[in-house]
């Protein structure tokens, strides 16, 4: 492995799913100049196994791993340089995480414009994966809200990029580019104004997959800023696809109960506990998932105008630190795909295949995506987005390869932030602009200074 100084450590790394481990030399420093020098050493060596930036490791796949090479932990580079309530702009280092940003920005009446399923994500990672959230139909993905970024490229230069400037092509290749165009050092994000830290939520339950699809197709989505659903992927038809749908918008002060109005912008997102690493493999199965799913569905119910805090409405899993340990040391595979809106019958077939497979998932997300952005490798396209978590067991690899084939056949795609096993051939077929992206990448990094396990697997170098 390439040595870049005393602060590096050989470390076994995985994604959040705890699969596909590899060992890399990890550099962890708050010194931006040291990061620049480390990249220069990789370049001077001719690239070798290369370098890749890593944030909090919440990607489920291998995009922030670099076996035999250098991984640069960006979390110490975490200064919030400025917050401007008038322009709604924040100037922040790439290692700032969304939890930290939310706490700092709320007193200014500003909200993070796009939140994924956890706040434990760095800004650099949010850009590199072009994360999306419950408001994709109304706000798009994270890259839509980046007004500029400073990118350390393979030649040692730090380039200031904007979405419409001279280097716009490189800007959009970096959004969703999984860190392979360079290292995002700093960014300016346009935030969302808010008068409270709470949501006004409406809940609905559906009895079948057809009802779930109908609810998302009747035009009511446009009334809500945020929308997502848990759905049942275990029960046989007609219960298959039944859902607990949660939709809402940020609350105004007038909508809050009296006890909350004195501190409407108070950050209210409690964590209950951190799970110990004691759970055996196999505990997550049909017999545990089935009753939990039934309970979750029954307790959800129909409601209107409920005031909820950030954890209740958006991040229930953040109440449990290290919740991925519940799947045991073998881990789990999070499979996320999107199918074009018009291919609804094909989408329903895939859900049926998942239910009949013998591979069971409880933590299931259903979301109808809105318009896509300009980034060649950005995941969201208008369509039916599904995310399921499969415990690792025999036969899973063969099954998800068959799912890949169906998703591709129906015009869909997988999300790089959730994948550590699909093939280069499949990925390239799913992303028709991948050659355009590779061309941009090679212009700024002809020596392949920036590399990762994912990049080698998907032939992106």
Swiss-Prot record:
Its main location: periplasm. Disruption phenotype: Traditional knockout mutant with dprE1 disruption could not be achieved, suggesting this gene is essential. Conditional knock-down mutant of dprE1 show that down-regulation of DprE1 results in rapid in vitro growth arrest, swelling of the bacteria, cell wall damage, stop of cell division or lysis, decreased survival in macrophages and virulence attenuation. Cells lacking this gene display impaired growth. The keyword Magnesium does not apply. Changing residue 368 to P: In strain: TRC12; Ty38c-resistant mutant strain lacking Rv3406, but sensitive to moxifloxacin. It holds the Pfam family FAD_binding_4. It comes from the Bacteria. Residues 19-194 form the FAD-binding PCMH-type domain. Changing residue 314 to C: In a spontaneous TCA1-resistant mutant strain, but sensitive to BTZ. SUPFAM superfamilies: FAD-binding/transporter-associated domain-like. Changing residue 387 to A/S/T: Confers resistance to BTZ043 and PBTZ169. Decreases M.tuberculosis cytotoxicity in macrophages. Does not affect binding affinity of the substrate to the enzyme, and only slightly affects catalytic efficiency. It is an enzyme of class 1 (oxidoreductase). GO terms for cellular component: periplasmic space; plasma membrane. GO terms for molecular function: D-arabinono-1,4-lactone oxidase activity; FAD binding; oxidoreductase activity. Pathway: Cell wall biogenesis; cell wall polysaccharide biosynthesis. PROSITE patterns: FAD_PCMH. It is found in: Periplasm. Changing residue 17 to C: Significantly less susceptible to Ty38c inhibition. 34-fold reduction in catalytic activity. Is inhibited by 8-nitro-benzothiazinones (BTZs) such as BTZ043 and PBTZ169; BTZs are a new class of antimycobacterial agents that kill M.tuberculosis in vitro, ex vivo, and in mouse models of tuberculosis. Is also inhibited by dinitrobenzamide derivatives (DNBs), which thus block formation of both cell-wall lipoarabinomannan and arabinogalactan via inhibition of decaprenyl-phospho-arabinose (DPA) synthesis; DNBs show high activity against intracellular growth of M.tuberculosis inside macrophages, including extensively drug resistant (XDR) strains. It catalyses: trans,octa-cis-decaprenylphospho-beta-D-ribofuranose + FAD + H(+) = trans,octa-cis-decaprenylphospho-beta-D-erythro-pentofuranosid-2-ulose + FADH2. One of its GO terms (biological process) is capsule polysaccharide biosynthetic process. Component of the DprE1-DprE2 complex that catalyzes the 2-step epimerization of decaprenyl-phospho-ribose (DPR) to decaprenyl-phospho-arabinose (DPA), a key precursor that serves as the arabinose donor required for the synthesis of cell-wall arabinans. DprE1 catalyzes the first step of epimerization, namely FAD-dependent oxidation of the C2' hydroxyl of DPR to yield the keto intermediate decaprenyl-phospho-2'-keto-D-arabinose (DPX). Belongs to the DprE1 family. Was identified as a high-confidence drug target. Monomer. Although forming apparent dimer in crystals, DprE1 does not dimerize appreciably in solution. Interacts with DprE2 to form an epimerase complex. This is Decaprenylphosphoryl-beta-D-ribose oxidase. It comes from Mycobacterium tuberculosis (strain ATCC 25618 / H37Rv). The lineage of its organism: Bacteria, Bacillati, Actinomycetota, Actinomycetes, Mycobacteriales. The gene is dprE1.
């Amino acid at each position: 492995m390439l040595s870049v100084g005393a602060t590096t450590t050989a470390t076994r790394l995985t994604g959040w799913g705890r699969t596909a481990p590899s060992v890399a030399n990890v550099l962890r420093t708050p010194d931006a100049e040291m990061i620049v020098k480390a990249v220069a050493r990789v370049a001077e060596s001719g690239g070798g196994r290369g370098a890749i930036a890593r944030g909090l490791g919440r990607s489920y796949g291998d995009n922030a791993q670099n076996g035999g090479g250098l991984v640069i932990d960006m979390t110490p580079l975490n200064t919030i340089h400025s917050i401007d309530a008038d322009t709604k702009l924040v100037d922040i280092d790439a290692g700032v995480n969304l939890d930290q940003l939310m706490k700092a920005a709320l007193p200014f009446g500003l909200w993070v414009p796009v939140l994924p399923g956890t706040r434990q994500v760095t800004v650099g990672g949010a850009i590199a994966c072009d994360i999306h959230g419950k408001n994709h139909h109304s706000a798009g993905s994270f890259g839509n809200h980046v007004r500029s970024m400073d990118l350390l490229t393979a030649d040692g230069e730090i380039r200031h990029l904007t979405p419409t400037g001279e280097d716009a092509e490189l800007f959009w290749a970096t959004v969703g580019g999984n860190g392979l165009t360079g290292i995002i050092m700093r960014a300016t994000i346009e935030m969302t104004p808010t008068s409270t830290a709470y949501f006004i939520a409406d809940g609905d339950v559906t009895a079948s997959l057809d009802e779930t699809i109908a609810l998302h197709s009747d035009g009511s989505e446009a009334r809500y800023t945020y929308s997502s659903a848990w759905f049942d992927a275990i029960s046989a038809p007609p219960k298959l696809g039944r859902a607990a749908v949660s939709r809402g918008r940020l609350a105004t002060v007038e909508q809050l109960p009296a006890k909350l109005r004195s501190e409407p912008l108070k950050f209210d997102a409690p964590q209950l506990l951190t799970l110990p690493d004691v759970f055996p493999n196999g505990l997550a199965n049909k017999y545990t998932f089935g009753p939990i799913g039934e309970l979750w569905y029954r307790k959800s119910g129909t409601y209107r105008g409920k005031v909820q805090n950030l954890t209740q409405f958006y991040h229930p899993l953040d109440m449990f630190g290290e919740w991925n340990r519940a799947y045991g040391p073998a881990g789990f595979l999070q499979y996320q795909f999107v199918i074009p809106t018009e291919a609804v019958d094909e989408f329903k077939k895939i859900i049926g295949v998942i239910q009949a497979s013998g591979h069971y998932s409880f933590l299931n997300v259903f979301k109808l995506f809105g318009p896509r952005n300009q980034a060649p490798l950005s995941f969201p396209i208008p369509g039916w987005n599904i995310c399921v978590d499969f415990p690792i067991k025999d036969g899973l690899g063969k099954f998800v390869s068959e799912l890949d084939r169906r998703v591709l056949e129906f015009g869909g795609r997988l999300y790089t932030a959730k994948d550590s096993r699909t093939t280069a051939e499949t990925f390239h077929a799913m992303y028709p602009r991948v050659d355009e992206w590779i061309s941009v990448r090679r212009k700024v990094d002809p020596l392949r200074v920036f590399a990762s396990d994912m990049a080698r697997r998907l032939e992106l170098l």
